[in-house]
Amino acid sequence: MKANKYLIFILGALGGLLYGYDNGVISGALLFIHKDIPLNSTTEGIVVSSMLIGAIVGAGSSGPLADKLGRRRLVMLIAIVFIIGALILAASTNLALLIIGRLIIGLAVGGSMSTVPVYLSEMAPTEYRGSLGSLNQLMITIGILAAYLVNYAFADIEGWRWMLGLAVVPSVILLVGIYFMPESPRWLLENRNEEAARQVMKITYDDSEIDKELKEMKEINAISESTWTVIKSPWLGRILIVGCIFAIFQQFIGINAVIFYSSSIFAKAGLGEAASILGSVGIGTINVLVTIVAIFVVDKIDRKKLLVGGNIGMIASLLIMAILIWTIGIASSAWIIIVCLSLFIVFFGISWGPVLWVMLPELFPMRARGAATGISALVLNIGTLIVSLFFPILSDALSTEWVFLIFAFIGVLAMIFVIKFLPETRGRSLEEIEYELRERTGARTE
């Protein structure tokens, strides 16, 4: 691929950075919000989970919008929504405004989760699709780390408004940057604009590959089914179920319990407020570094092998952490918790973190890719909502180690699911994957 065109993918993936920032920033901001706006454990859970309720709506609506408006224009709209939500949060003076701001941010987060991976996948040449698709996850981890660093920087002045409001900066960069980016060539071809699709492909593809790729795209488009006909068809229904289960397993393994409540977990272990936030910075740094490694291996190692290997590592980390907390006690095991959470992040960041966002768009056909990815993202957000809402409740009711054991058991189920139900997609064009899945499920391809 032409090296100077990576800017397209970096700017396209900025939506992932905003998703990560708004996921990560709340863990530090919660330590100080309650000093200005009274919060108890219930209202704290509502503030955290309200973003996820918005994300469910955003993910569910953005899929059809991405297919109708185009990937690029929808990302521009998402950036505007991010800006509005961040400004409301920064200006919040009561619980209601906090919840409204988080709901609006959630709309943008849900839209970003379903639209950005599709845009990156459809723009990328086959041999680089895994690496470039992983840019979305890398940006998510950079956003989380940026949130932790901002939290630490403003901890001394208890500046939670700055923590929440600074999301405006990358939102404006995304809005301006995506304005100058091209539309997905597959969306252009789907909307009968072959010449524009060819011009875009000249930017990201080698010239020798363009005719072959366009031929495959047109053959798939020749299957005369509308978006909703494809979505309602039995063959896609089976694939959509696989995609949704894949998405919800990523959350039920417990990653966002770590992201949302990392500062609170460290505080419970006996660290001070600033030290708890600094511990989260370390977690975020590891997340970024291991995702960079994933970018270089995701197109060299089969996707399923990465997922299974990551599962084994995450399960081991959770089990060790649970046993040590059980035997030593959470107040006496702060550094053990940091080490175990770090290992958990390493194994997640090399596997389920990037691979989910690479594979989801790969599983679905062109005519329904935006809508089907949106539905999967909606289900993922429901899973995130359940985890974030019930983790502190279960942690108090059952103790933290039992919650980690539950996550480990779910990790075993996730590994079985990957082995039995997920197809391998590495090294194959999106059109080749669609042909195979149609044949495996008995759908016509003529």
Curated annotation (Swiss-Prot):
Extracellular side of membrane: 32-38, 91-94, 153-154, 270-272, 325-329, 400-401
Q: What is the effect of changing residue 137 to A?
A: Loss of transport activity
Location in the cell reads: Cell membrane
Q: Which GO terms describe its molecular function?
A: symporter activity
Q: Which residues form a coiled coil?
A: none
Q: Which SUPFAM superfamilies match?
A: MFS general substrate transporter
What is the superkingdom listed in this entry's lineage? Bacteria
Outcome (variant: residue 251 to A) = Loss of transport activity
Q: Name the membrane topology term.
A: Multi-pass membrane protein
What activity regulation does UniProt give?
Inhibited by carbonyl cyanide m-chlorophenylhydrazone (CCCP) and by the human glucose transport inhibitors cytochalasin B, phloretin, and forskolin.
Question: Record keywords: Magnesium included?
Answer: no
UniProt keyword annotations, A-Z: Cell membrane, Membrane, Sugar transport, Symport, Transmembrane, Transmembrane helix, Transport
Residue ranges of the TM segments: 7-31, 39-64, 71-90, 95-122, 130-152, 155-180, 235-269, 273-295, 304-324, 330-363, 371-399, 402-420
Site for Important for symport activity, residues: 22, 105
CDD domains associated with the record: MFS_XylE_like
> What InterPro entries is this protein classified in?
MFS_dom, MFS_sugar_transport-like, MFS_trans_sf, Myo-inositol_Transporter, Sugar/inositol_transpt, Sugar_transporter_CS, XylE-like
Gene Ontology CC: one annotated term: plasma membrane
Cytoplasmic side stretches? 1-6, 65-70, 123-129, 181-234, 296-303, 364-370, 421-446
What is the similarity comment for this entry?
A: Belongs to the major facilitator superfamily. Sugar transporter (TC 2.A.1.1) family.
Q: Which NCBIfam families match?
A: SP
Q: Which PANTHER family match?
A: PROTON MYO-INOSITOL COTRANSPORTER (PTHR48020:SF12)
Its job: Transporter highly specific for glucose uptake.
- What name goes with this protein? Glucose transporter GlcP
Origin species, per record, is Staphylococcus epidermidis (strain ATCC 12228 / FDA PCI 1200)
The organism's taxonomy opens as:
Bacteria, Bacillati, Bacillota, Bacilli, Bacillales
Name the encoding gene, please. Answer: glcP
